[in-house]
C-alpha cells in the first residue's frame, strides 16, 4: 500500500518549518514520513495536489513567493504526481454519485485525491481528516507536522 499526500499535509508543513530553508524542510518531511506512513511505503501526491500547491505559489505575495516556490518545487521533485486515469475517473464518478445520493458534500479536489488513491489501492495522508471521512471506501492516515 502507498500513501497519497493531500495539500493539507504541505500547508501544515509550511507552517511548521517557516524558519527552515526548503532543503531542511524536505529533510523534516522525510524524517516524519518514515515514522508516520512507514519508511518502506510508496508516497506520492495527486496531480490536483500539484496544481493546488502551484496555485499557492502564484497567489503568494512577492515577499513570500520565492520561499514558497522553492518549497513547492522540492515537494514536486520528491513526490511525483500519481496519474489520474480512466480507473480513477470511474472511482471518482462513483464516489461523487454516492455522496450526492446521501446528501453529503466533499470538495471536488478532495474527491479527485480520494479517487486517485482508491484506484491505486492506496490511502490518503492528510492533516485534515474531516475532508475525507465521508468517503466510506477510503483508507486515511492523519499526518501532522505541527502537533
Residue ranges and their predicted role:
Residues 45-48, 127:
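Substrate-recognition element of Asp-dependent hydrolases with the DxDx(T/V) motif
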Residues 1, 114-147:
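Acidic, PIN/NYN-like endoribonuclease modules and their adjacent C-terminal/linker elements
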Residues 6, 12, 52, 110, ...:
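Acidic active-site catalytic centers that drive phospho-/nucleotidyl reactions
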Residues 8, 70, 90, 111-112, ...:
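Active-site phosphate/pyrophosphate-handling residues
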Residues 10, 50-53, 89, 132:
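A generic structural signal for short hydrophobic patches within well-formed alpha-helices
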Residues 1-45, 57-74, 147:
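Short, well-structured N-terminal submotif of metal-dependent ribonuclease cores
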Residues 55-58, 66, 78-125:
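Active-site neighborhoods of divalent-metal-dependent phosphate/nucleic-acid chemistry enzymes
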